[in-house]
Amino acid sequence: MKKIIIFVVLVLGAVYFFSNKYFYKPPVLRIGSECDYIPNSWEENFQSDSNIPVTNHKDYYAEGYDIQIANLVAKELGMTPSVVKLKWEDLIEALLRREIDVIFSSMLDTEERKRLIDFSIPYELKKTEYAVMVRKDGKFADIKKLEDLYQARILSQKGTYFEDAIEQIPGAVKATPVITVSDMIEELDNGKVDGIVIDVDTGTTYEKMDDDLKLITFPEGEGFIVGFSGVCAGVRKNDRRLLERIDTAISKITPRMRQRVMDQVISKVWHNNPNP
């Protein structure tokens, strides 16, 4: 009888061990992202060794700086990353409705947003700076300061800090905001506006992709004044433990690692030529 009991215990132990080792599925981290903001996030219709499936867009995969930072965070947390593509203006609402667990979408921790959700420490490569993008053949192609954009028709993305930034351009005409950065670029390309407000990193990427566009940056103290810490991950206010774990994971991503991620992402932009 004793031998039978020992045998049963050994069998049960073996079953438990192998079931955990071979059948354990780590929890999923549902990442909300706009997937329309090269080089930070976009989607592509092929799988690679680095992109992440978009759960609500069949046969599409998310890629970009935001996505790869989120991937590193998920791995540090022992979770499987999955991306949910959302319109920019729907990201916070989806988070509050628990449709996603975290936002990784180049979101800035503005005071208005901090009243709704909590933010991680910044994960950007360098401090976010704003610039103006114009057409090379346009009448504002040679401006040197914000004041030179007097009476220029300037466009922004709806629901972003780009909208507020236009208010800092004396005498500028504020065009009706559009939904995505791609929409901004299209409006500018088609000559419907004189310029757009965009962050330097994204603007630099689009400038290299479109020979008709020119990115204009401003010396420190002469450009846009921004009221935020930087690009951060967003979580619900009651998810304090998750926020602490995300902060710890982000803190382990060194500046050199962040630069390597960005370099790899930029390389993929040129080689894969995604169509955002």
What are these regions (language model features)?
Residues 69-70, 90-94, 100, 183-187, ...:
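Short, hydrophobic alpha-helical packing/hinge segments within bilobed ligand-binding/sensory domains
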Residues 35-36, 124-136, 207-250, 268-276:
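Periplasmic-binding protein-like
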Residues 17-18, 161-178, 214-219, 247-276:
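Ligand-binding clefts/hinges and TM-proximal coupling segments of bilobed small-molecule sensing domains
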Residues 35-38, 59-76, 131-183, 200-201, ...:
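Bilobed "Venus flytrap"/periplasmic-binding protein-like clamshell domains
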Residues 1-12:
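N-terminal Sec-pathway targeting helices
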Residues 67, 71, 75, 80-148, ...:
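Acidic, polar ligand-binding/catalytic clefts
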Residues 24-107, 115, 174-177:
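Extracytoplasmic small-molecule ligand-binding "clamshell" domains
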Residues 69, 145, 199, 237-252, ...:
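Short amphipathic alpha-helical coupling segments at ligand-binding clamshell hinges
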